[in-house]
């Protein structure tokens, strides 16, 4: 799933921000699995 759950680590959180900013233009705390 693309939005599976909340991010637990800073690294994953940062990557999720970059990914979601490019794809959806949103600033949320989800990560890809």
Curated annotation (Swiss-Prot):
pH effects: Optimum pH is 8.
Compartment(s): Secreted
Gene Ontology biological-process entries: blood coagulation; fibrinolysis; proteolysis
Top-level taxon of the source organism: Eukaryota
Keyword Secreted: yes
EC number: 3.4.21.7
Temperature dependence per UniProt: Optimum temperature is 40 degrees Celsius.
GO molecular function annotations of the record: serine-type endopeptidase activity
Function, as annotated: Plasmin dissolves the fibrin of blood clots and acts as a proteolytic factor in a variety of other processes including embryonic development, tissue remodeling, tumor invasion, and inflammation; in ovulation it weakens the walls of the Graafian follicle. It activates the urokinase-type plasminogen activator, collagenases and several complement zymogens, such as C1, C4 and C5. It cleaves fibrin, fibronectin, thrombospondin, laminin and von Willebrand factor.
Protein name: Plasminogen
């Amino acid at each position: 799933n693309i939005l599976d759950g909340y991010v637990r680590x800073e690294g994953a959180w940062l990557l999720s921000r970059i990914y979601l900013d490019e794809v959806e233009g949103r600033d949320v705390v989800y990560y890809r699995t």
